[in-house]
């Protein structure tokens, strides 16, 4: 006699995604019940296992005819139990309360049978094999026993039963003792905790790589800027530009290369606008290298890379520009110069409107007290934004941004534990930045139309084209 497959096949489970109806959850539950009934008929066709079966112990080799009711055999430790979710149910049934898998085939365990947690099918298979002293044809393939194929190789299935600790001497009555249930819950929680720790380690590694790329690719960062603005640098303090005379002096030294390209004879506002463009082009180059270092970005289609940078660079520039600003002015020329806010406000229109909105944003952004590790993740999330116009692989980019935003959230919780609303505040800044860039692009178009001497750099002209 052998344990053969039942002609009644279990129904294949349905995936939740296949059902869009709000009744899908209840429908799936009913299908699960039908599946369990079908399986029970197929696996247990030889008869039900009642109380009388628990009395039958004498035919097993080595049995002393006794019933073990309080101990587990060493091999039946639940150490290999996978990590299911522990529902907050008060039901004492092990299968429903802990959602434990069968140690043999991975199906849902119906209880604690023969020393291990097992499903009804594997419990019945083991009982029949022992009671009838069945001997199966030897198999050397070490078949993997799963729910879908557990009836195909009885030899390997029985060997799996023995290897996980099933024993006819380990029968016991009643519910799982509280002490064992607590132990099993603790084991499951430990497994879940270990899995969470592993995921956290991966996320921290991603955050570290992005932060390192940020420090590597940008000449100025917040740490350097704050030291200079606080007057704590060991080098000479920055040269202060507060009027036209000091501006001319700075143009001969600090930004000489920027004004040596045919704009020397232009008026001060035009020269200032030209210098702003030069600094923007340098930052775009740095941002491009930083983006390439973001894990997953280089795998994108080249067109998608260009699109993400086109729409993201100015949002990133104004974010990082905040680190160089305080309420009185901003650092320029890698921290060697400082131009006052008041001087910029006194430039003639429309040039006086260029920087003031950036100062307003910077004061609010700096109030969040972010450091470079926070800003690096924020800038990476800005660049990898899946809602930019014209993207091809939107799904991949959205997953890329989702991972970065998740790392950002965890990092903020760790780095700023007392500010529980910092993450939503930072997400709001993404919205503010889009508005800021839109207004800036509109102002640049006004300058381009009204100021004949204020030519746009070719790279920036390409970025602004069809931007907003």
Swiss-Prot record:
GO terms for biological process: behavioral response to nicotine; cellular response to fructose stimulus; cellular response to starvation; circadian regulation of gene expression; enamel mineralization; epidermis development; fatty acid metabolic process; gene expression. It is linked to Peroxisome proliferators are a diverse group of chemicals that include hypolipidaemic drugs, herbicides and industrial plasticisers. Administration of these chemicals to rodents results in the dramatic proliferation of hepatic peroxisomes as well as liver hyperplasia. SUPFAM superfamilies: Glucocorticoid receptor-like (DNA-binding domain), Nuclear receptor ligand-binding domain. Highly expressed in liver, kidney and heart. Very weakly expressed in brain and testis. GO terms for cellular component: nucleoplasm; nucleus. The gene is Ppara. The record marks 433 as: Essential for heterodimerization with RXRA. Belongs to the nuclear hormone receptor family. NR1 subfamily. It is found in: Nucleus. Heterodimer; with RXRA. This heterodimerization is required for DNA binding and transactivation activity. Interacts with NCOA3 coactivator. Interacts with CITED2; the interaction stimulates its transcriptional activity. Also interacts with PPARBP in vitro. Interacts with AKAP13, LPIN1, PRDM16 and coactivator NCOA6. Interacts with ASXL1 and ASXL2. Interacts with PER2. Interacts with SIRT1; the interaction seems to be modulated by NAD(+) levels. Interacts with CRY1 and CRY2. Changing residue 292 to A: No effect on interaction with PER2. It comes from Mus musculus (Mouse). Keywords: Activator, Biological rhythms, DNA-binding, Lipid-binding, Metal-binding, Nucleus, Receptor, Transcription, Transcription regulation, Ubl conjugation, Zinc, Zinc-finger. The keyword Zinc applies. Residues 99-173 bind DNA. This is Peroxisome proliferator-activated receptor alpha. Ubiquitinated by E3 ubiquitin-protein ligase HUWE1; leading to proteasomal degradation.
């Amino acid at each position: 006699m052998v344990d053969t497959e039942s002609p009644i096949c279990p129904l294949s489970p349905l995936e939740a995604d296949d059902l869009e109806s709000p009744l899908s959850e209840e429908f799936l539950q009913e299908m699960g019940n039908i599946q369990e009934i079908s399986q029970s008929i197929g696996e247990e066709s030889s008869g039900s296992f009642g109380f009388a079966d628990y009395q039958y112990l004498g035919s097993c080799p080595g049995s002393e005819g006794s019933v073990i009711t309080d101990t587990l055999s060493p091999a039946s430790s639940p150490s290999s139990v996978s990590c299911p979710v522990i529902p907050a149910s008060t039901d004492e049934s092990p299968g429903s309360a802990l959602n434990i898998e069968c140690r043999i085939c991975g199906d849902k365990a119906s209880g604690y049978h023969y020393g291990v947690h097992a499903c009804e099918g594997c419990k019945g298979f083991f009982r029949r094999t022992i009671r009838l002293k069945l001997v199966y044809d030897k198999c050397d393939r070490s078949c993997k026993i799963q729910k879908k194929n557990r009836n195909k190789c009885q030899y390997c299935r029985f060997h799996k039963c023995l290897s996980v600790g099933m024993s006819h001497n380990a029968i016991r009555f009643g519910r799982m003792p509280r002490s064992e249930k607590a132990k099993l819950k603790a084991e499951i929680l430990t497994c879940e905790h270990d899995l969470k720790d592993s995921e956290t380690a991966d996320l921290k590694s991603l955050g570290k790589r992005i932060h390192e790329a940020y420090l590597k690719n940008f000449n100025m960062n917040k740490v350097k800027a704050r030291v200079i603005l606080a007057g704590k640098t060991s080098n000479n303090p920055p040269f202060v530009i507060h009027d036209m005379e000091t501006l001319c002096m700075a143009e001969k030294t600090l930004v000489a290369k920027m004004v040596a390209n045919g704009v020397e004879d232009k008026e001060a506002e035009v020269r200032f606008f030209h210098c702003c463009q030069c600094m923007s082009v340098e930052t775009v180059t740095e941002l491009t290298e930083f983006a390439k270092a973001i894990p997953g970005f280089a795998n994108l289609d080249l067109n998608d890379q260009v699109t993400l940078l086109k729409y993201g660079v100015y949002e990133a520039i104004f974010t990082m520009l905040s680190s160089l600003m305080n309420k009185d002015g901003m650092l320029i020329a890698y921290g060697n110069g400082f131009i006052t806010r008041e001087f910029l406000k006194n430039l003639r229109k429309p040039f006086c409107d260029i920087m003031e909105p950036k100062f307003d944003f910077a004061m609010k952004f700096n109030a969040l007290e972010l450091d470079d590790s926070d800003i690096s993740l924020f800038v990476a999330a800005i660049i990898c934004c899946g809602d930019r116009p014209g993207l091809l692989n939107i799904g991949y980019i959205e997953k890329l941004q989702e991972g970065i935003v998740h790392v950002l959230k965890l990092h903020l919780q760790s780095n700023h534990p007392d500010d529980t609303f910092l993450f939503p505040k930072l997400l709001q800044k993404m919205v503010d930045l889009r508005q800021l860039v839109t207004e800036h692009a509109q102002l640049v178009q006004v300058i381009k139309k009204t100021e004949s001497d204020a030519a746009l750099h070719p790279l920036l002209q390409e970025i602004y084209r069809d931007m907003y």
